[in-house]
Amino acid sequence: MDVLEMLRASASGSYNTIFSEAWCQYVSKQITATMYMYCALGMMGVLFLAWFMYFKRMARLRLRDEIARSISAVTNSSGDLRGLRFRKRDKMLFYGRRMLRKMKNVSGQMYSSGKGYKRRAVMRFARRILQLRRDNMPLEMRTVEPPAEYLEETIEGSDRVPPDALYMLQSIRIFGHFEKPVFLRLCKHTQLLELMAGDYLFKITDPDDSVYIVQSGMINVYISNADGSTLSLKTVRKGESVTSLLSFIDVLSGNPSYYKTVTAKAIEKSVVIRLPMQAFEEVFQDNPDVMIRVIQVIMIRLQRVLFTALRNYLGLNAELVQNHMRYKSVSTMSGPINSQTSQSSRQTPNGPPMGISHPLNLMQSTASGTGSGSGSGVSVTVTRPPPSPSRHSREEHTLSDPNPNPDGSVHGTSNLFTEVHGDAPNADLFHQQQQSVGNLSTRRSSITQMTPDGSHSCPPAPGVTTSIDMRLVQSSAVESLRKELGLSEEDAHIIEPFVELRELEPNVTLITEGNADDVCVWFVMTGTLAVYQSNQDATRAKQDKSDMLIHFVHPGEIVGGLAMLTGEASAYTIRSRSNSRIAFIRRAAIYQIMRQRPRIVLDLGNGVVRRLSPLVRQCDYALDWIFLESGRAVYRQDESSDSTYIVLSGRMRSVITHPGGKKEIVGEYGKGDLVGIVEMITETSRTTTVMAVRDSELAKLPEGLFNAIKLRYPIVVTKLISFLSHRFLGSMQTRSGSGAPGAPVEANPVTHKYSTVALVPITDEVPLTPFTYELYHSLCAIGPVLRLTSDVVRKQLGPNIFEAANEYRLTSWLAQQEDRNIITLYQCDSSLSAWTQRCMRQADVILIVGLGDRSHLVGKFEREIDRLAMRTQKELVLLYPEATNAKPANTLSWLNARPWVTKHHHVLCVKRIFTRKSQYRINDLYSRVLLSEPNMHSDFSRLARWLTGNSIGLVLGGGGARGAAHIGMLKAIQEAGIPVDMVGGVSIGALMGALWCSERNITTVTQKAREWSKKMTKWFLQLLDLTYPITSMFSGREFNKTIHDTFGDVSIEDLWIPYFTLTTDITASCHRIHTNGSLWRYVRSSMSLSGYMPPLCDPKDGHLLLDGGYVNNLPGHLWRYCRASMSIAGVFPPFCDYRDGHLLLDGCYTNNVPADVMHNLGAAHIIAIDVGSQDDTDLTNYGDDLSGWWLLYKKWNPFTSPVKVPDLPDIQSRLAYVSCVRQLEEVKNSDYCEYIRPPIDKYKTLAFGSFDEIRDVGYVFGKNYFENMAKAGRLGRFNQWFNKEPPKRVNHASLNEYTFIDLAQIVCRLPETYAVNTADLFSEDEDCDGYISEPTTLNTDRRRIQVPRAGNSLSFSETEMDSDVELDLKLERKTDKSTQSSPPTSSRTSMRGKEEARHMDNWHWGAKHKNETGSGATEGIHTSTEQEQEHQQQQQQDQGVRAEQLVYKDEDKENRSSANNETKN
């Protein structure tokens, strides 16, 4: 609130009547009346006390006399009884009665009588009186410190495993998972090497054919430069290894590898374990599946680290690939291809293959003896010079640029011959060759021409290629691809059916970056292909239109092997540079060839390795791969920083230990983040301890590698400076907003963006499956999302996937799904099964789902979850039925019983979630629900935005009666379709924000705000609240009552929407952020304007709290913190916090618009509304001194010009708001906040009677403001998920289409992944042909998040079968339709075998049955009608056989709707 106006009015004398007459008369009367009453009461109290003490004394004396008489009587009679004794028969009777008497006394204590009953009653009464005040206090939230395991790393202990075996096991893990027998066979080939200090482990020209593991000591790896100098690459310590993944592929391919620039020397006496790479060769001969997986793991690591991390963080693009021009030999004769020249290209895989001649016979016939003995023709050899010595040859290439740059690449076939002869070749040459071939047998060929618009046609090839027999071109392509794949001449028939040809015009895109559907192996016959990557350094305006040129692919070269081996999406965009002819083999065909010849993976891998630059090999030697289990530390505080780490998978937590031993979370890191780079570059010790929150994989980049790269490529320094600058600015913003004691521990906004979420039910009554569907439905509006259950994984990967032997397949598959989706939902089982434990290991955050109206007790299963995932962040989700209109209550009991919960969410659920139906009925219901557009204002959408880091925050500033404009702005925000996920407020903004979070209905909020404003206009009640102005003018009793009546005894934890208020803590001289506790008290504290009300005393620690606007004017029981936020200093007394006793004042003194606090709490987009008063800055310059008499003269003289000089109250107010003004300027200049100020300056701070008028001003201004934002296109970041248009059909890919490619399973014919047990046929998420994933386009482009999700065809795990009785009834009704719509299976039988055909028949039968039973749900299931089967068979005939395709893609909306209409008819 603003105190300036009231102080000015009081100084001018407008309030003299109030303070001099009414106040003095009232006080004098009250003092006179109460003086006599207090005297009388005092006298009566003294008399009563004297009477009580007298009678108590007399009673004590009478009791003492009576005891003395009793003792004397006993002593006088003892002498007569001394000689008597019991008879034997009386002795037993006496002791028996005595024992029974004792038993009676014991049993009597069970009733409300007996000995000691009165004493116990008095004690209970006293205890009740002593605890009377404590019982009246609200329930407090326990401030329980997180468990030690949450902030401490696990101490390593490996006593059960010998050190040498442990080190070797960790070192060879980089090649993937090895079973125990395979590992023991590798151990037999190990050798121990003992080195003294200064001895070489290996030198230049030594064979690079071993893996070295340091068992003890220390080894230094050096790199030799061209000038003869050496540079330390890394230091290998105990347990670490020295190896090269690229050399591993060279050795297995039969190409000897030698150290060219790398040497290793012992720093001290060391013992090294040597494992020859030939040992793997022996193992691979007996276990080809192990070889396939090792090659796949190596290729995946190369792609994720070398082609992703080095590109993103160091700006290396073209430097990673050799862009040299290879010597080509193009023969125009039909003759055998020179095998010697082909083999010579593999003699030096490590260096640039200069002088390599690779023949390309376009005229060779594949028929044995046909054309091989034809006359000698003209052999044309094209030799190109090596590239220029420039190390930074980069090129920007726009997608719309049709003209390639003149860089020496081949431009069409005509240019190829013009380079040699000077003009185009004679067409008679090709005509003669065509006549010498004769009649050749007809072969299968697929020759198409692709135009830039994506259409396919068959025009004649450009230039001289029109006279070439396509059969000869086909045979030449087969022969060239056979040699590239390392197959013998006898194996030519294996690849011949799968080789396809294509004619390309310039600038035709073969595949785009991130595309996983069109992966092929392309072989260039003529022309040139260009390989691009998206430009990371380009601005946002150019990033979507420009790509970075990486290298060219010339005739005789192959491309596409990396994506083929990894099974992932393509890392490059490939386009034709000129008129070109290519031969290609599709992914499914390659996998079929691998089944017959598994060793082609080595040739594909060797082709990828040959293309890499020497820089990549040096990086390969320097990189270390680290696998950490949950709790293991990457590095510890105060250790030396000699390396940085790239998070490949998992989640890391950074913890700082203060000098007193207290630990605090600094931040968390997810996939792709760079950890520890600041300390490494600044050469300082580690400032924090970084540990693994869950099972994680990291790549370690040593400092020597960075130095070597910086010396060779100075552009890396610029990239690092840009990266460090952004990180430094982010840390500074975080510190500025989280420096207060009340700030939350998790101040890093990145912490709230998760990629994996585990859903755990508290009890069996929780509808977890409907809850997961609803959350999935809301997440689909943001981006690609995937829902996984135990049945889904079993159907996709096999029933035994959770066994230890399948660990690699499961982890790799899950990792790939996480890469392709922005978030993955892991739905746990209701028991502690293997799948539930896997979910705990994979989760970044665990959502504990419970029913808000049930008991808050912690179950045994929930405690086990906390034990398994102690370091994983856990959040509580409480569900409430919408029909009962229930509000959250007793949330503190839930949180106090679960100290491991860091955050909670209240979710209002529709009726369908709590309907008890069969699993099939639930899935059938959501098959229709998921076709609709999700409600962006629902609690599920709010939770979805929180999990993905897209929360929208609303900050309401302080300004007294002008805060009525907040109500109008809230209505305008709601009409604009902007959801509100978090609310923060100061002063009057704290009151309005708390009303919105509690009611979420604009009508109810308006009514309650109007009633409170009317109470503030009743001045007679305020006059009764006046007091002696020592601390403040008012006592605050009536003001507290108005706020308490508005909110009641509601806690901040019980609000629907996350809420915080900000107050000024005058005890600790800082601002405090209140996210829990009494609502009305902290709202009152935030409104405690200095001078009007006393500060509120914080009940937590006793600190005095004032209006938070003094430090930040835009930011328990609910009313308390609202009251604290409105404690205007001087008007209302400071509010005392009931927790710690701190005095709280109005938050406007520190931060009147706390948008920075909202940003630190996790809001990505913020709307800040400021209604505070603005100071007049146009003041009079009065010189060096100022006379008060002169100001008085100027004020009273009407004939002089007025002067603007601040008075004493104005100066004090401006001093109080200095911090607030600085904070407000930072908010206005921030890019995450939309600052809005309605035109309400003409209304005074205390004009509460103009509530409706101020509200209408705010509404009209807000409506026009958001309409203008929508027209300008700036409203998208707030309602980018809001779509007013009717839903449209969008084709989505299924999980089976883009699934994990396990090459070992494909090649070695392991058990089929879709095989399921009969016991699982009617389980959750069941379908006869394996799981079809949730609707998601697996394109991870960021632009996807800006496109509103339209209703579309969805496929997910809802296609469970009905019971047997239901199936029989439905089959009897629709037997004819089932017979007519059954698709033929002959084509699938020839393609996939009898077993797969039977499996596909069952799947199509289930899909057909689904179409019959639910007409509305047919659009959401991947079915196959007769039209679709014909269309798919036609595509297979045109494009070749796809062996591994398990399901078929959806057709467009028209085909689908027409097919459904036919099914209905």
From Swiss-Prot:
Alphabetical UniProt keywords: Developmental protein, Endoplasmic reticulum, Hydrolase, Lipid degradation, Lipid metabolism, Membrane, Neurogenesis, Phosphoprotein, Transmembrane, Transmembrane helix
Catalytic activity, EC: 3.1.1.5
Bilayer topology term: Single-pass type I membrane protein
Family membership: Belongs to the NTE family.
GO molecular function, one term: protein kinase A catalytic subunit binding
Protein name: Neuropathy target esterase sws
Main location: endoplasmic reticulum
Reaction it catalyzes: a 1-acyl-sn-glycero-3-phosphocholine + H2O = sn-glycerol 3-phosphocholine + a fatty acid + H(+)
Domain PNPLA residues, every copy: 954-1120
Organism for this UniProt entry: Drosophila erecta (Fruit fly)
Subcellular location: Endoplasmic reticulum membrane
Active site: S987 (nucleophile), D1107 (proton acceptor)
Extent of Polar residues compositional bias: 331-349, 434-454, 1413-1424
PROSITE patterns: CNMP_BINDING_3, PNPLA, UPF0028
Described purpose of this protein according to its UniProt entry: Phospholipase B that deacylates intracellular phosphatidylcholine (PtdCho), generating glycerophosphocholine (GroPtdCho). This deacylation occurs at both sn-2 and sn-1 positions of PtdCho. Its specific chemical modification by certain organophosphorus (OP) compounds leads to distal axonopathy. Plays a role in the signaling mechanism between neurons and glia that regulates glia wrapping during development of the adult brain. Essential for membrane lipid homeostasis and cell survival in both neurons and glia of the adult brain.
Motif residue range(s): GXSXG: 985-989
Short sequence motif GXGXXG: positions: 958-963
Alphabetical list of Gene3D superfamilies matching this protein: Cytosolic phospholipase A2 catalytic domain, Jelly Rolls
Source organism phylogeny: Eukaryota, Metazoa, Ecdysozoa, Arthropoda, Hexapoda
